[in-house]
From Swiss-Prot:
Presence of keyword Transport: yes
Purpose of the protein: F(1)F(0) ATP synthase produces ATP from ADP in the presence of a proton or sodium gradient. F-type ATPases consist of two structural domains, F(1) containing the extramembraneous catalytic core and F(0) containing the membrane proton channel, linked together by a central stalk and a peripheral stalk. During catalysis, ATP synthesis in the catalytic domain of F(1) is coupled via a rotary mechanism of the central stalk subunits to proton translocation.
Protein name per the record: ATP synthase subunit delta
Membrane-protein topology: Peripheral membrane protein
InterPro entries the UniProt entry points to: ATP_synth_OSCP/delta_N_sf, ATPase_OSCP/d_CS, ATPase_OSCP/dsu
Coiled-coil ranges per UniProt: none
Lineage of producing organism: Bacteria, Pseudomonadati, Pseudomonadota, Alphaproteobacteria, Sphingomonadales
Length: 184
């Protein structure tokens, strides 16, 4: 398998690698990717689901029942549903967000793409995402999958991270640089 040591070195990366291997064997990479995107949205939008994944007070049985019900209501594919059960059984639901990111990286690499983690102060429009992908494609000479995150604390602009490279064009970064320069 063509995984980087960085992904395999982390706990979430090992889970993502295992899920990716199963999805590839079952020719279900696209279905699992879609299910994981639904779960990512649920983590972002639902306080209850986020608490379920992070609370140490939830028992294994309760967590397994809750993720099964959540998977059914979100229309999650069977492989991802079983995987959620494994995470719940092993008390690793707190790793779900990182597993989703790692799986996205593995999936993009499988398609011959590079993944760019993009942080913006406000949600980007489809047109902005398309323009960003086109610009990154010309810079990198390959297709780019974009993993979007919204963080109002950057005030404006973008932070783009591709592998170990980071381009920080945020207003927060510019203001910090200006403050340091003014201190002299």
């Amino acid at each position: 398998m063509e995984n980087s040591g960085g992904i395999q070195a982390s706990l979430s990366g090992r889970y993502a690698t295992a899920l990716f291997g199963l999805a590839r064997d079952e020719k279900a990479i696209d279905a699992v990717s879609a299910s994981l995107q639904s779960l990512k949205a649920a983590l972002t939008e639902s306080d209850d689901f986020r608490r379920l994944t992070t609370s140490p007070l939830v028992s294994r049985d309760e967590a397994m029942k809750a993720v099964a019900a959540t998977a059914a209501s979100l229309g999650i594919d069977p492989l991802t549903t079983k995987f959620l059960g494994v995470l719940a059984q092993n008390r690793r639901l707190g790793q779900l967000g990182a597993v989703i990111r790692s799986f996205g990286t593995l999936s993009a690499r499988h398609r011959g793409e590079t993944t760019a983690e993009v942080t913006s102060a406000h949600p980007l429009t489809a047109t902005q995402v398309k323009a960003l992908k086109a610009k990154l494609k010309t810079q990198l000479d390959r297709d780019v999958a974009v993993d979007l995150t919204v963080d109002p604390s950057i005030l404006g602009g973008l932070i783009v991270k591709i592998g170990s490279r980071q381009i920080d064009g945020s207003i927060r970064s510019k203001l910090n640089s200006l403050a340091i320069a003014m201190k002299g």
